[in-house]
């Protein structure tokens, strides 16, 4: 699943091609994604200019004068920029939506169709008030995210520290891959109860989350199965994993074999020596 780095890489890749440009038309080939695409979306967006593209957690927010269309990549979604002059590229089986601009097509592809394309009209209020966004935690690169915040919000909680990271109620965008990698950098075992982690260790974890996500964005994200950036290129951060998907291999720091456990039906990887 695309996590925050992959979504941010996508945002940075597509914004120069769509920001300030007029949507000439929209072609919806598959209206039934995770939720139905609004039937009048193509009519609503025709002739509108995209003001900017922002990210909130794993959601991409495209602002026009009348509101925002929201894109979530789900498990296997990608957004690619394709040149359609002089000849538009043919759509493949899993290419569900095209936003067509003067020279480029923004194409949404999603083999498993767990993603979403939604509409939030301006009269409904700020887009951050949308039900899918209103309850999200803080952004990991914002000043609001800190070890003190995590420490305060986890007091008395028995859920594991990894599950607390994944929940998205404290900090957004940290999925399974980057939770495992961040906990390794912070030296914290993923099964440790969130309420038992000290403030000092949460300070280390907050720094580790920021460092891990920034490094992943710099490498274009992780490509394990489906993810490619807006230009069709794969990310390379998976080559730098310390623990994720490395069960049985030696720790890059101490040489101890990496262990794999299951938490909440997801695989978790850690070094039993470096993480305590």
Curated annotation (Swiss-Prot):
InterPro entries: DNA_glyclase/AP_lyase_DNA-bd, DNA_glyclase_Znf_dom_DNA_BS, Formamido-pyr_DNA_Glyclase, FPG_cat, MutM-like_N-ter, Ribosomal_uS13-like_H2TH, Znf_DNA_glyclase/AP_lyase, Znf_FPG/IleRS. Belongs to the FPG family. Its cofactor is Zn(2+). It catalyses: Hydrolysis of DNA containing ring-opened 7-methylguanine residues, releasing 2,6-diamino-4-hydroxy-5-(N-methyl)formamidopyrimidine; 2'-deoxyribonucleotide-(2'-deoxyribose 5'-phosphate)-2'-deoxyribonucleotide-DNA = a 3'-end 2'-deoxyribonucleotide-(2,3-dehydro-2,3-deoxyribose 5'-phosphate)-DNA + a 5'-end 5'-phospho-2'-deoxyribonucleoside-DNA + H(+). GO terms for biological process: base-excision repair. It comes from the Bacteria. Its EC number is 3.2.2.23, 4.2.99.18. Involved in base excision repair of DNA damaged by oxidation or by mutagenic agents. Acts as a DNA glycosylase that recognizes and removes damaged bases. Has a preference for oxidized purines, such as 7,8-dihydro-8-oxoguanine (8-oxoG). Has AP (apurinic/apyrimidinic) lyase activity and introduces nicks in the DNA strand. Cleaves the DNA backbone by beta-delta elimination to generate a single-strand break at the site of the removed base with both 3'- and 5'-phosphates. DNA binds at residues 94, 112, 157. A zinc finger (FPG-type) spans 242-276. Monomer. Transmembrane segments: none annotated. One of its GO terms (molecular function) is damaged DNA binding. Keywords: DNA damage, DNA repair, DNA-binding, Glycosidase, Hydrolase, Lyase, Metal-binding, Multifunctional enzyme, Zinc, Zinc-finger. Pfam families: Fapy_DNA_glyco (PF01149), H2TH (PF06831), zf-FPG_IleRS (PF06827). This is Formamidopyrimidine-DNA glycosylase. Signal peptide: none annotated. PROSITE patterns: FPG_CAT, ZF_FPG_1, ZF_FPG_2. The active site is at 2 (schiff-base intermediate with dna), 3 (proton donor), 58 (proton donor), 266 (proton donor). Binds 1 zinc ion per subunit.
């Amino acid at each position: 699943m695309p996590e925050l780095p992959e979504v941010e890489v996508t945002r940075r890749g597509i914004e120069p091609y769509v920001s300030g440009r007029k949507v000439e038309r929209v072609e919806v080939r598959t209206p039934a994604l995770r939720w139905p695409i609004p039937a009048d979306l193509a009519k609503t967006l025709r002739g509108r200019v995209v003001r900017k593209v922002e990210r909130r957690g794993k959601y991409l927010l495209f602002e026009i004068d009348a509101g925002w269309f929201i894109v979530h990549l789900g498990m296997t979604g990608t957004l690619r920029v394709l040149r359609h002059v002089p000849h538009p590229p043919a759509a493949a089986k899993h290419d569900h939506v095209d936003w067509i601009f003067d020279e480029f097509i923004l194409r949404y592809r999603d083999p498993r169709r767990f993603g979403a394309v939604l509409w939030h009209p301006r009269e409904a209020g700020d887009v951050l008030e949308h039900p899918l966004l209103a309850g999200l935690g803080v952004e990991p690169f914002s000043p609001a995210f800190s070890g003190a915040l995590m420490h305060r919000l986890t007091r008395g909680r028995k859920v594991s520290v990894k599950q607390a990271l994944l929940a998205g109620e404290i900090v957004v965008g940290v999925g399974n891959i980057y939770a495992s990698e961040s906990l390794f950098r912070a030296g914290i075992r993923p099964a440790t109860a969130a309420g038992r982690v000290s403030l000092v260790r949460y300070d280390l974890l907050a720094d580790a989350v920021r460092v891990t996500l920034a490094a992943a964005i710099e490498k274009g994200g992780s490509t394990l199965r489906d993810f490619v950036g807006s230009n069709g290129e794969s990310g390379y951060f998976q080559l730098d994993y310390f623990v994720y998907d490395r069960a049985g291999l030696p720790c890059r720091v101490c040489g101890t074999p990496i262990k794999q456990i299951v938490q909440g039906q997801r695989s978790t990887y850690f070094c039993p020596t470096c993480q305590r």
